[in-house]
Amino acid sequence: MQIDLNADLGEGCANDEALLALISSANIACGWHAGDAATMVQTVKWALERGVAIGAHPSYPDRENFGRTEMQRDPEHVYADVLYQIGALDAIVRAQGGELHHVKPHGALYNQAVRDPALARAIVRAVRDFDADLVFFGLAGSQMIDIAREAGLRVKQEVFADRGYNPDGTLVKRGSPGALHEDEEVALNQTLTMVREKRVRAIDGTWVPIQAETVCLHGDGAHALAFARRIRERLGAEGIAVRAGD
């Protein structure tokens, strides 16, 4: 058994270089919610040195709120936004002799696309038009994944180690009770259950079927690095290999 571990990097956290030793895929901020050209260059360099798969992490133009505030942007504007950000990171990756592997939307853009098919189609179209061989990372079981598949893209269904789930398989909104698992043991057990048993316990206590193909580890927070080490060690102890795959 194997699983991909991904983390959002290039967002101004001090853990990036150390996290790259523990993950298999890196989603690099493209400057619109965090980071800049210099952080993109440095993070790509570190990822290439460690053989970590590199992905673009496009967002709404929202540095003030870290890309976590919902916006009502026209799908054509979103298409252009995403295409622009992928292109910027791809140029940096190619300049260093690497190859872009995937795209994962960030924050509010990601969560709104789970609910809004027009938004999801705009994001997916930008990815496909840029490079139809890129892998699309999206919320496991969501219409965003279905739309990407219908467009002919390869997908990785993403689950979250430290986030709470609603009974419909969506994430509990940040700031709401149960949105984040502060207890590392709870997050570890949730991850193993999702990977091994293909299910997750929702905040109402019900079990929700889920397909875990990549697990997101958040790189921010005081204990992020220690938790990443624990989850990597636990997966190894359970005989689960960590690798990006195709």
Swiss-Prot record:
Keywords, sorted A to Z: ATP-binding, Hydrolase, Nucleotide-binding
Pfam families of this UniProt entry? LamB_YcsF
Superkingdom: Bacteria
Q: What is its EC number?
A: 3.5.2.9
Chemical reaction(s) catalysed: 5-oxo-L-proline + ATP + 2 H2O = L-glutamate + ADP + phosphate + H(+)
Q: Which InterPro entries match?
A: Glyco_hydro/deAcase_b/a-brl, LamB/YcsF/PxpA-like
Which Gene Ontology BP annotations are present?
Answer: carbohydrate metabolic process
Q: A Gene Ontology MF term for this entry?
A: 5-oxoprolinase (ATP-hydrolyzing) activity
Coiled coil segments of this chain: none
What Gene3D superfamilies does this protein map onto? Glycoside hydrolase/deacetylase (3.20.20.370)
Q: Does the keyword ATP-binding apply?
A: yes
Concerning its family, UniProt says:
Belongs to the LamB/PxpA family.
HAMAP family hit by this protein:
PxpA
**What is annotated about its quaternary structure and interactions?**
Forms a complex composed of PxpA, PxpB and PxpC.
Q: Which function does this protein serve?
A: Catalyzes the cleavage of 5-oxoproline to form L-glutamate coupled to the hydrolysis of ATP to ADP and inorganic phosphate.
What is the official name of this protein in its record? 5-oxoprolinase subunit A
Its lineage opens with:
Bacteria, Pseudomonadati, Pseudomonadota, Betaproteobacteria, Burkholderiales
Q: Which gene encodes it?
A: pxpA
